[in-house]
Amino acid sequence: WVFGNPYFGSWGHKYQIPKEQLENIQNSKYIFLSHGHPDHIDPDSFDIFKNKTLILADHYGDRIYNALKKNYNCLKLKNNTWLEISKNIRIKAFADWNQDSALIIEIFKKNILFHLNDGQALGWSKTIKDLIKSYDNRFLLKLINWGDADMINFYNNNHFILPLAANKSPCGESYNYYMKKWNCNYAIPFSSMHSYIREDSIKMNEFTTPLNLHYENFNQKDGNLLPAFIRWNCEKNDFSEINPKKNIEEIRTALDFGDNWSDELESSDERDLNDYFQKFYHLKKKFGFINFRIGNKDFNIKLSNRKEGIKIETPRNSLIFAIKNNIFDDILIGNFAKFELINVPSLYPDFNPYVAKYGDNGNARSKNELKQYFDYYKLNSVNYWIDFLRIKTEEIIRTKLTNYKKIYSIARLVRRKL
């Protein structure tokens, strides 16, 4: 994401990209695309792709690869396979079952950059840990913040529910935890330099993490948490800071991006919405309905006779664009849409992954498609069952404690100190 405003104009860059760094991007021979979120692969940045090799992980469905290979030089890298891109640099990619991917970058045989981005390296955790630990300098690049980069705009009877991010838990403790988990001795604030610029999402800036607070409660016994913007000298093991200027973002209206909160659904929109959500087999097992409040009218989609449901209030234009282009996650992360959960504690694990990740990105919606999808990752992920059992255990605990945010925060802190 170099140019543009992802998530239907909701996000902007918090910092300017200096001219020198922009030239470095434009002069690079390779670009790694980790996943499909527009803050990682924004259409307004596509001109940069010309005359470059785009590297992608080996995902089920190959959605991004198939879309881009028509116009760009794309290289699909097999999992856990070294690719030498210069005399002193080689890389490995790892695809996980959430349609995220991680990248290992080896420099001079002694430095490792572990580019985890927004993911968890599901199915590859032990393999990656064992690989990283033998290097001198091990850098962790991972999304760590208070937790705004997901749908947090939840309501209960028109009253906004404070998200977990409102606790503003010290990020330094999270850096310590993840550095220890991944055997890294350096970390850099990463994948968190955005702000909200749409008039209907700017309130979420309260929950974005100021750069200085990334270092709060960080314990240097586990390594070094470096400044966010640096040039690292691999020969001298030293760095210099870049110090980019902060952007002063102009607040944009929803209309600037084609959204009018007064627009109502047309009959064809209702058919498209119903067709889109009825394809998801798993939703029918877990939810009874999804109700859309668009303009001044409600449109209800019945999925089953269950009592669990979701109410969504959002502008028509971006919603219809999202379902027609299979990018519903952009509605969630934009945080201008309002969500209300009925008899269900969270969008995880039964809505978000099945719609946005396995469905939209993996093209797996029916019972049979989901089986093929997970069979693929079972066969192509060395540590699948280790990570699967860990994730399922965490989901059970998180679901039980969702209504007790303080207890959940304390439990998470205790777990990370063990």
Pin down the residues of each PLM region:
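Pre-active-site segment of Zn-dependent metallo-hydrolases
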Residues: W1-L33, P43-D44, A121-D136, K311-I312
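Active-site HxH/HxHxD metal-binding segment of metal-dependent hydrolases
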Residues: I17-T81
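Mobile, glycine- and charge-enriched loop segments
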Residues: N24-I25, K92, Q99-S169, E250-F257, ...
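Active-site neighborhood of phospho(di)ester-bond hydrolases with catalytic His/Asp-centered motifs
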Residues: N27-I41, I55-H59, F114-G119, F139-N145, ...
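Active-site environment of divalent metal-dependent phosphoester hydrolases
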Residues: G36-I41, D62-Y65, T81-E84, N98-D100, ...
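Metallo-beta-lactamase
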Residues: A57-N111, E216
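Cap/insert and terminal regions of metallo-dependent hydrolase folds
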Residues: K126-K221
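Feature captures hydrophobic
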Residues: W232-L418
